[in-house]
């Protein structure tokens, strides 16, 4: 229970840091450059991850992620222990998307460094659309937390849902 409280506190802390940095950081304009390009680099990594997640092989998505990833959606936290468990979770997500007969479209992407060249958060607003009618079903906001590893580069280690500003 103590470990869960720590994880929740860290999620809230990092989320607040990222929100503040994203709002204050001038790099949020799409054509602006950051000091070393790491935010744009991480956004490109996220776009590649998202494309493979939706159109490619799920096993290829694992290369973008640490084996232990924390997912927090609707006040429920799931932590994977290894790539096998992570693969099963992603497979379940993809099957659920097929069952709902929806596709996901990106509405906006921005990023902010939480710790210079060490942790970056990508803030994504997406829409879920009906495959039959192409109508927007709902809009959602998700934070993707990336950690830079010395040898392996940027890896996704946490994904959390967030309320949209009009939902607050």
Residue ranges of model-derived segments:
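Sec-dependent signal peptide recognition
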Residues: 2-9
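Hydrophobic h-region of N-terminal signal peptides that target proteins for export
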Residues: 11-17
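Short, low-complexity N-terminal intrinsically disordered segments enriched in polar/charged residues
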Residues: 18-59, 63
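Short beta-strand edge/turn micro-motifs at domain boundaries
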Residues: 20-26, 138-168
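Short, solvent-exposed secondary-structure junction/capping segments
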Residues: 47-51, 63-78
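An amphipathic alpha-helix signature
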Residues: 58-62, 67, 83, 87
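A mature extracytoplasmic/lumenal domain signature
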Residues: 65, 75-77, 123-126, 160
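Surface-exposed, charged secondary-structure patches
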Residues: 87-133
